[in-house]
Design a protein with these regions (language model features):
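Membrane-embedded alpha-helical bundles that constitute the cytochrome b-like, heme-associated redox core
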Residues: 1-210
Length: 210
């Protein structure tokens, strides 16, 4: 029996959508508190920046643990055959090559920003600890600042690209799926091979060649 192309299939579980939007809000607040003062908008940005940074670190840690132990981490790995399939125009399983690349590059940038940001907390007075600007020598602090700034610029650029592509008419099904969790079989079939990703994890025990 033919499958109904208008039938809804699940793309994102509720917990994944919550993680995405918490991360998105944290990134937007971090970008605002980092770059708005540079262009002349003055406000007390340090508390907002470090508190939001801690929230982002917790969210990232949750994602790493969840992906490693409760999800199929390998479905996001990029293998040589994925490059060959993309070049040949072959449809992907659950995640396309551009989606995997975005996840990998953005994830790396967020990890660098989080790690360097955690070190920079030594220079911030909080209710939990007193600042210690002498934790590292001047040269090492310079490296930390450069890495943090480069990661922030990368995150800003990738976020703008992510928002742009999510608003394109042909990609809007992904945005709706990130909001409501579902897309139609017809929408999924535009970029995904139904034989490799059906929208039902029970039917895709190995993400079917992902």
């Amino acid at each position: 029996m033919a499958l109904d192309p208008k039938a809804l299939i699940t793309r994102h579980a509720p917990i994944d959508r919550v993680f995405h939007w918490v991360t998105a809000l944290a990134v937007l607040l971090l970008m605002a508190s980092a770059f708005l003062p540079i262009v002349g908008l003055e406000f007390s940005w340090v508390p907002l920046h470090w508190i939001t940074g801690v929230v982002l670190c917790i969210a990232v840690l949750f994602h790493v643990v969840q992906s490693t132990f409760f999800r199929r981490l390998k479905c996001m790995l990029i293998r040589p055959r994925h490059l060959r399939e993309f070049a040949a125009g072959k449809k992907a399983a659950k995640y396309t090559l551009p989606q995997k690349l975005m996840h990998a590059v953005l994830g790396f940038a967020v990890l660098v920003a989080s790690a360097t940001g955690a070190i920079m907390l030594a220079k911030v007075d909080t209710p939990l600890w007193q600042r210690n600007p002498y934790l590292l020598d001047a040269a090492t602090w310079g490296v930390v600042y450069v890495l943090h700034g480069a990661a922030a610029l990368a995150i800003l650029t990738l976020t703008m690209a992510h928002v742009y592509f999510s608003l394109l008419p042909e990609k809007r099904a992904y945005l709706r799926a990130m909001i409501g969790g579902q897309m139609t079989r017809e929408e999924a079939a535009q970029f995904h091979d139904p034989a490799r990703w059906s929208g039902n994890r029970k039917d895709d025990p190995k993400e079917n060649g992902q």
